[in-house]
Amino acid sequence: MTISPEDYDIPAHYKHWVGDKAEDHIGPFFFTLEGEHPRTAFRVQEHNCNAHDSVHGGVLMAFADYTLCMGANGGENESVITVSLNSEFTAPAFKDDLIVGKGKVVRRGKSMVFVSCELFANEQVVLMASAVVKLLKKR
């Protein structure tokens, strides 16, 4: 099954990362790269919301993790794992909002990448995060 960004009113130049069932169930999530910096997007659906009708914090954290890992692996089909993730919620987001992630690679080592991101809804920051991501060796 092909998952298309246009089906979620997301620009066509975004790509779907194939193979992560959890991300597809929560999102689906989409990405593009500006150099080595990821730009990510997902459209909030009803199943992403909590009892307050705002996006569940766990959904935002999962999307932040996706954004951070896209920066670490450079959008390639590389396996990575999150070693640590810190996040701060700054504002709510709601059903039908387009959540856009802007990631930044802070430092890239041989096996660890330090990354940060901000998530936006309606041009307002809703979450800030930073992480250490480990690059896994190819088998």
Where are these predicted regions, by residue range?
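Terminal targeting signals and extreme-terminal segments of soluble enzymes
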Residues: 1-139
